[in-house]
């Protein structure tokens, strides 16, 4: 467990998260308007989104399915009966004067997610609920010195709000939870998890306490927009609360905003309670009733999820848990890996994938889907190394050409004449030449200067243009030098 070091001793973090995940859907939660990102302002607004009188909401079935699939991925209970409620408050970018949400009877409850801790153990984070709700529009205050503008393109877009219990005990655990949840949503296809575009936003409820004491007064930090800022915001807010408590002041329950530039939180408003929103069932929407048949159908069609892939990679491919997690962290990488792993040694493939390929992708600032090397060609390269057709050193040269051109490795090896020299007679001839040309070094090695062995290996590799089989060179050199 992580602690905050105060002037009067240690304090514990108590953290709960609320994740707002924009549902991957071509249309909004209660209207047919498009959800394309960065469209011209107010170009994707229906009469329903603009709350014109007499316009009634119609529930998007696809959004419901996405929420159910996400609930299944979170090992949660899917409620067969749920209700939409009106959450009443006034914002300029909320034309209805209320938000349609689910307060009393959410669609999903009682889920769990396991995250790795700093000790290497797994920790279970309980998920209180997942409910459906509609997003608000966007207020823009920097377009004119005299006016604020409203863009309603986002108004009515479907959101899944995923709420954890206060089980998170450090900023790093909070970051791990969000990373793992984002990856799960991407595998399921229910949210793209792009925090920069705002399609996944995080609110953190933070309090501090002495070990063994009751929960303290919490403050909510709104709209944290990156993994890094989750850590920074929690660290700052927890330290702020500790400083107040140690100076004899009380924590005021409030909503605060995190400033990424200053790394500080500031007061936004006093924290509201449920009564302030006057929740009541939306009279324009019938209760949502979900059948066992639908749940079973969606469950049967779920893709293989990250934890399942990690288990498969460690058991079937004998990868370390760390390597499996690195590959599974990106669905595109996992898909690429599986296609290649069916044709070559998975462990050797992993080494090349996580070192050489990741390095080149980062250098070129591209994703694996933009890589010119096909999974099949990558597997061929690994097999050429496995079969001693080329050395690891030559393989790096071949790999660089493949990355630039997309050519098959066997073609490159053939064109460049890079086949590894593994003929004993040829290598013995080269070794004899090296020994004859360096009598003083031979005498030094035989008198106990073992480090000179590397010199002889280097000379053989130089004479063969780096194409000599290094394992065979080592074996033959030892025989020659010890005779």
UniProtKB/Swiss-Prot annotation:
Gene3D superfamilies: 1.10.10.410, GatB domain, N-terminal subdomain
Keywords assigned by UniProt, alphabetized: ATP-binding, Ligase, Nucleotide-binding, Protein biosynthesis
UniProt entry tagged with the keyword Metal-binding: no
Catalytic activity: L-glutamyl-tRNA(Gln) + L-glutamine + ATP + H2O = L-glutaminyl-tRNA(Gln) + L-glutamate + ADP + phosphate + H(+); L-aspartyl-tRNA(Asn) + L-glutamine + ATP + H2O = L-asparaginyl-tRNA(Asn) + L-glutamate + ADP + phosphate + 2 H(+)
Single GO MF descriptor: asparaginyl-tRNA synthase (glutamine-hydrolyzing) activity
InterPro entries in UniProt: Asn/Gln-tRNA_amidoTrfase_suB/E (IPR017959), Asn/Gln-tRNA_Trfase_suB/E_cat (IPR006075), Asn/Gln_amidotransferase (IPR018027), Asn/Gln_tRNA_amidoTrase-B-like (IPR003789), GatB (IPR004413), GatB_C_1 (IPR042114), GatB_Yqey_C_2 (IPR023168), Gln-tRNA_amidoTrfase_suB_CS (IPR017958)
Enzyme class: ligase
Record-level GO BP terms: glutaminyl-tRNAGln biosynthesis via transamidation; translation
Function per UniProt: Allows the formation of correctly charged Asn-tRNA(Asn) or Gln-tRNA(Gln) through the transamidation of misacylated Asp-tRNA(Asn) or Glu-tRNA(Gln) in organisms which lack either or both of asparaginyl-tRNA or glutaminyl-tRNA synthetases. The reaction takes place in the presence of glutamine and ATP through an activated phospho-Asp-tRNA(Asn) or phospho-Glu-tRNA(Gln).
Complex formation: Heterotrimer of A, B and C subunits.
Full protein name: Aspartyl/glutamyl-tRNA(Asn/Gln) amidotransferase subunit B
Taxonomic source organism: Rickettsia africae (strain ESF-5)
Gene of this entry: gatB
């Amino acid at each position: 467990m992580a602690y905050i070091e105060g002037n009067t001793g240690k304090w514990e973090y108590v953290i709960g998260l609320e994740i707002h995940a924009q549902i991957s859907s071509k249309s909004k939660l209660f209207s047919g308007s498009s959800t394309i990102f960065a469209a011209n302002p107010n170009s994707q607004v229906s009469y329903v989104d603009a709350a014109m009188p007499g316009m009634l909401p119609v529930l998007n079935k696809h959004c419901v399915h996405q929420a159910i699939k996400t609930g299944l991925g979170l090992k949660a209970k899917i409620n067969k009966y749920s209700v939409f409620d009106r959450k009443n408050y006034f914002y300029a970018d909320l034309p209805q004067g209320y938000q349609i949400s689910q307060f009393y009877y959410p669609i999903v409850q009682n889920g769990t997610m396991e995250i790795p801790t700093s000790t290497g153990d797994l920790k279970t984070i309980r998920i209180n609920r997942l409910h459906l709700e509609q997003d608000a529009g966007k207020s823009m205050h920097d377009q004119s010195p005299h006016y604020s503008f409203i863009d309603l393109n986002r108004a009515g877009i479907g959101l899944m709000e995923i709420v954890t219990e206060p089980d998170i005990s450090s900023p790093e655990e909070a970051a791990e939870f969000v990373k793992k949840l984002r990856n799960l949503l991407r595998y399921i296809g229910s949210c793209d998890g792009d925090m920069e575009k705002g399609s996944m936003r995080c609110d953190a409820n933070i309090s501090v306490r002495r070990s063994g004491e009751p929960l303290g007064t919490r403050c909510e930090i709104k709209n944290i927009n990156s993994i890094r800022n989750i850590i920074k915001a929690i660290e700052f807010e927890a330290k702020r609360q500790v400083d107040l408590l140690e100076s004899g002041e009380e924590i005021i329950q409030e909503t605060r905003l995190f400033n990424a530039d200053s790394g500080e939180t500031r007061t936004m408003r006093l924290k509201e309670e449920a009564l302030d929103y006057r929740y009541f069932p939306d009279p324009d929407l019938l209760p949502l009733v979900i059948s066992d048949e639908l749940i079973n159908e969606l469950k049967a069609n779920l893709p293989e999820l990250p934890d399942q892939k990690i288990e498969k990679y460690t058991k079937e491919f004998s990868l370390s848990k760390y390597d499996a997690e690195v590959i599974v962290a990106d669905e595109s990488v996992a898909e690429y890996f599986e296609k290649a792993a069916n044709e070559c040694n998975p462990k050797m493939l992993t080494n090349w994938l996580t070192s050489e390929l990741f390095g080149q992708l980062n250098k070129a600032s591209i994703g694996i889907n933009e890589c010119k090397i096909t999974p099949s060609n990558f597997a061929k390269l690994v097999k050429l190394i496995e079969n001693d057709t080329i050395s690891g050193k030559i393989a790096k040269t071949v790999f660089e050409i493949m990355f630039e051109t997309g050519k098959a490795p066997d073609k490159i090896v053939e064109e460049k004449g890079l086949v590894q020299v593994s003929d004993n007679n040829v290598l013995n001839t080269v070794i004899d030449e090296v020994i004859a040309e360096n009598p003083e070094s031979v005498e030094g090695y035989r008198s106990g200067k073992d480090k000179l062995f590397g010199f002889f290996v280097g000379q053989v590799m130089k004479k063969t243009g780096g194409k000599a089989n290094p394992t065979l060179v080592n074996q033959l050199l030892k025989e020659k030098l010890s005779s």
